[in-house]
Amino acid sequence: MKKKQFTILVLVLIIVVGIAALILSRNRPYKPTSFVVDGDNWSATVVDGSSILLELNNNSKEWSIISEPETFVSDFHTITENISEFHIIALNDGEGEMVFQCTKDDGSTVQYILALSISRHQKIHLQIDSLSFKECT
């Protein structure tokens, strides 16, 4: 009889430990990922997973946003002597493109696309997974 009780006790302990492990793994705290992407005359830093500091070289250029998606938005634009800095915030998960226009001193313009892929974690946290910044062709 004691062997049977011991076996039942071991099975119950295994089940309890398994359920506890499942609960703990599902309720892990979200840890945002930050990263930096550098390109020719630009740099983007993902901060706390859901916002970007985009720095664009200002040498004889003026930068402006001409189109924004629904998934992210720029809330401020700072201009220093050599850098235009845009602060971009993720609003929703999905993919989107923001179009920037560069106006040079001679009046010519070139457009660039900032493309983001944003995912959602634990229903409330947004994470920027990838970004690219390239000239429109």
Where are the language model's segments positioned?
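N-terminal Sec-pathway targeting helices
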Residues: M1-I15
